[in-house]
Amino acid sequence: MAQPPPDVEGDDCLPAYRHLFCPDLLRDKVAFITGGGSGIGFRIAEIFMRHGCHTVIASRSLPRVLTAARKLAGATGRRCLPLSMDVRAPPAVMAAVDQALKEFGRIDILINCAAGNFLCPAGALSFNAFKTVMDIDTSGTFNVSRVLYEKFFRDHGGVIVNITATLGNRGQALQVHAGSAKAAVDAMTRHLAVEWGPQNIRVNSLAPGPISGTEGLRRLGGPQASLSTKVTASPLQRLGNKTEIAHSVLYLASPLASYVTGAVLVADGGAWLTFPNGVKGLPDFASFSAKL
């Protein structure tokens, strides 16, 4: 069984890195990464930069991406532009893309990684809470993709990788909001792959499973997630890590996947095949509510 690559829990760069791919795989490309200031998005930015790519990392929190950009540039020697941007606001997206194009003159890759999630029964989920997740995950993915298509990809081609989930593959308790949003993004991936393929634009999804060192796992799995029977009973019997997910995204974004479009690559150690759907846990959330 292949051993996972080394990773670190927090939003810090790897102390050492061994290239599994050619070090100049993305030499002088530019990647625009939403949600790039933390978690999976941060590690994607780092791995891309370790393969020669410059990055733009965008998040609502400017202090977060400023700190992240300093770490990333210091560890990799590549350029990283931090931008404050709310994916739900098309004017903010347009301004951010314009700034990125002014800085680099091009954008070759878009990684849609901004997302929101929490546990809540459907009957206790406020209308606004459901809408908020749909706005960030689904509308946000379309907004950034649409703006980049108009401003650069339509005339120059490009690659889009949408970070989704396996929640929509079957019914999952406490996740109607995130499952619906991510399933919609997977459908969007297929539609855009069909429409934009003739402009030399590839569009794919990457669906991670439970990943250590992420805010998502802390919210959904708790501090003992790695010891959960759900994890130990999954095919690979462990959590994934952020570097593994970044490697999968690197493949999809690179020339290695030049004939891959409209696909959903699941990188979850087979977890969705064996994880229970959470119905037995519903009584524990009987008095729970979410009113964002």
From Swiss-Prot:
NADP(+) binds at residues 35-40, 60-64, 86, 182, 208-214. SUPFAM superfamilies: NAD(P)-binding Rossmann-fold domains. The modification N-acetylalanine is found at residue 2. Its EC number is 1.3.1.124. GO terms for biological process: fatty acid beta-oxidation using acyl-CoA oxidase; fatty acid metabolic process; unsaturated fatty acid biosynthetic process. A motif (Microbody targeting signal) lies at residues 290-292. Substrate binds at residues 60, 88, 118, 126-128, 219. It is found in: Peroxisome. Monomer, dimer and oligomer. Auxiliary enzyme of beta-oxidation. Participates in the degradation of unsaturated fatty enoyl-CoA esters having double bonds in both even- and odd-numbered positions in peroxisome. Catalyzes the NADP-dependent reduction of 2,4-dienoyl-CoA to yield trans-3-enoyl-CoA. Has activity towards short and medium chain 2,4-dienoyl-CoAs, but also towards 2,4,7,10,13,16,19-docosaheptaenoyl-CoA, suggesting that it does not constitute a rate limiting step in the peroxisomal degradation of docosahexaenoic acid. This is Peroxisomal 2,4-dienoyl-CoA reductase [(3E)-enoyl-CoA-producing]. It comes from Homo sapiens. The lineage of its organism: Eukaryota, Metazoa, Chordata, Craniata, Vertebrata.
